[in-house]
Amino acid sequence: MRRRAFSFAVFLAFAVAGQTISSQAVSDRPADVRTAFARAQHLKHGINASEWFAQSANDYSAARTNRYTDAADVALMAKLGFDNVRLSIDATPLEGWPHGADGLNSEFLGRLDKAVDAMLANGLAVTIDLHPESSYKEKVRTTSEGVDRLVMLWRRLAAHYATRDPERVFFEIMNEPEVSDPYRWAGIQARVAAAIREAAPRNTIIATGPNYSDIQDLLTQQPLADGNVIYNFHFYDPHEFTHQGAGWGSAWWSYTHGIPYPATESSMPDLVKEVPDAATRFQLERYWLDHWDAHRIRLTIDEAAAWGKTNNVPLICNEFGVYREHADEQSRMNWIRDVRTAFEADGIGWAMWDYRGGFGVVWKDDGQPAKVDEKVVEALGLAK
């Protein structure tokens, strides 16, 4: 979940050239496609279990992971009405010592197994989301050795989890690949998918576009030859609103607070005047003039839905959300509701980012019971 950088000219070039990004015709694999559509029904209302086994490179110890999210949290996810969990997993600790017979870190993998099995026991589908740090992705982007490493890791990981229920265990090739060349990513993704399929013949794969998995990245791709695949994108538009106050990504985000959604003629002028520097003021003025509201969001998500329909493949969006520390609460709920309803209108399953992090549906301290944000639950349409 990062800042997106995108050139419209490059997009147009690849949107045309993308017709040559190869795959066999979808009509050649109707049975597998039907399986993917059927299993996508297990991924309708999801939540991201972030910063547990990924995004915490300084500490993947049992002492931390056992307290960060626990069995009570998994049970709460199911109780709140989520039907699936996207479990983010860093690649590096999987490859570390001590190695088991399968070449994976047996101690770390044992803790992962416990989490996956708890989710399955609570009736939740699980996406095994390979979620490496940018340094790992850089090697994939720039070297053949990095790709070989990724393929081998997935061969081992898929074989390990192929023993679980294939109806409810999904394999996501890589979170936000940060590979800017759509052609290179198409080749990498096809190779990884083939390795997964060899190791796990029955499981459904989740594929994505290059870069940061935005809608425009998805549109550069053609379906894989493998029919048992669900296609994924992420949605955080407009970043001026969803990432206000964030201390990562674009530097100016950290200086913006209280940006309303939707932007109105009455709410924006005074806010823009308070911004001292011209560059940040320009960003806020652009957000205001772009008229982001439920209609604009629906039109944007319709573009992804049209790609899925054209290619006869199921779609999910397994990241969307608003950084909550500096966002106006009601505006945050407005955005979550509008995005969620747009997904559902287009038949697209979703997974909100995230459970207890900066975009969370609960507040929680390590080792303590979670406190549910009932307004988020309501905005997600899960309130009974």
Give the role of each language-model region.
Residues 1-4:
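Positively charged n-region of N-terminal signal peptides that target proteins for export
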Residues 7-17:
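Bacterial N-terminal signal peptides
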Residues 26, 33-37, 148-293, 302-322, ...:
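Active-site region of glycoside hydrolase catalytic domains
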Residues 28-204, 209-218, 228, 359, ...:
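Active-site mouth of glycoside hydrolases
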Residues 30, 67-71, 298-301, 333-336:
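Structural motif corresponding to alpha-helix initiation and N-cap regions
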Residues 126-128, 315, 350:
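Hydrophobic beta-strand scaffold residues
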Residues 325-384:
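Aromatic-rich peripheral "rim/lid" segments of glycoside hydrolase catalytic domains that contact
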